[in-house]
Regions:
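Bacterial N-terminal signal peptides that target proteins for export
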Residues: 1-10
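C-terminal motif of bacterial Sec signal peptides marking the signal peptidase cleavage site
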Residues: 18-21
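Extended repeat-based scaffolds of very large eukaryotic assembly and lipid-transport proteins
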Residues: 25-128
Length: 128
């Protein structure tokens, strides 16, 4: 009888742990999907594709940009990881860096930067 209770309790504990792990993975996937889809929406805005000012893309897509910022600390970690792994240094990377600075708030140690990769390089130097 005691063995059955222990076995049953162990099975319930394992099931609960699996549900938590799956839930955390799903949340991470939601954050990455939310950021990726909103970045693509901003970058591909047809009305301002000719603008060379990255701020114009944010101004024309405030809702999509706000959704990126709504991802909080988990979004910040994803943005930095994506920026670090990107082989490009264009508009998308600039937007990722800008969102990162806003998510960091007062913790942002980089004042002047020219591109997304420039911001990341300076940020890494100051954090490490």
């Amino acid at each position: 009888m005691i063995r059955k209770r222990i076995a049953s309790g162990t099975m319930m504990l394992c099931a609960a742990m699996m549900l938590v792990a799956c839930s955390n993975q799903t949340e991470s996937q939601n954050v990455s999907w939310k950021i990726d889809s909103n970045l693509q929406h901003i970058v591909n805005e047809p009305e301002i594709l000719t603008s060379s000012n990255p701020g114009d893309y944010i101004a024309a897509n405030t809702e999509a940009y706000a959704q990126i910022l709504d991802t909080g600390e988990e979004g910040l970690n994803f943005l930095i990881q994506q920026l670090d792994s990107s082989s490009n240094d264009g508009l998308k990377e600039w937007l990722m860096a800008q969102a990162s600075t806003e998510l960091l708030g007062e913790r942002n140690l980089v004042e002047h930067w020219q591109s997304g990769k420039d911001w990341l390089r300076q940020y890494k130097m100051k954090v490490e």
